[in-house]
Regions:
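Residue-identity detector for threonine
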Residues: 2, 33-35, 101
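Amphipathic alpha-helical binding modules
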Residues: 81-113
Length: 113
């Protein structure tokens, strides 16, 4: 039996936290309908982030390409996403907050070599 160091344990805990939050997220309905471009922005972000989450959960770490994509996305900011959450009210605001929490967890995962 091998013992894991503090870094590996922390990474495992973050993966478990990500899995729980993602499972909660995918089992909740999308908070809006219609053709509002702000809702479409939120849906697009959710889909994009979801593909990164699924890969990270499968491998237990962040793919290097996904890590780069997340860094670029964070550098560009979430202005449109924040605006949509603020303007569309509470169900969307809560949904966006959960997505940003998921993104924060992803960023904290180790990057696969």
């Amino acid at each position: 039996m091998t013992s894991r160091g503090p870094r590996e344990r922390a990474a495992s805990e973050q993966v478990l936290r990500l899995r729980r939050l993602w499972e909660e997220h995918v089992h909740r309905p999308f908070p809006g309908t219609g053709t509002d471009p702000r809702l479409q922005e939120v849906a697009l972000y959710s889909s994009w982030l979801g593909s990164i989450v699924e890969a990270a959960l499968e491998g237990g770490a962040l793919d290097p390409l996904h890590a780069d994509m997340l860094k670029i996305h964070r550098a560009e900011g979430n202005r449109e996403l924040f605006r949509a959450g603020g303007e569309l009210g509470d169900p969307v605001r809560s949904y966006v907050a959960r997505l940003i929490t998921i993104e924060d967890i992803l960023i904290s995962l180790p990057v696969d070599k």
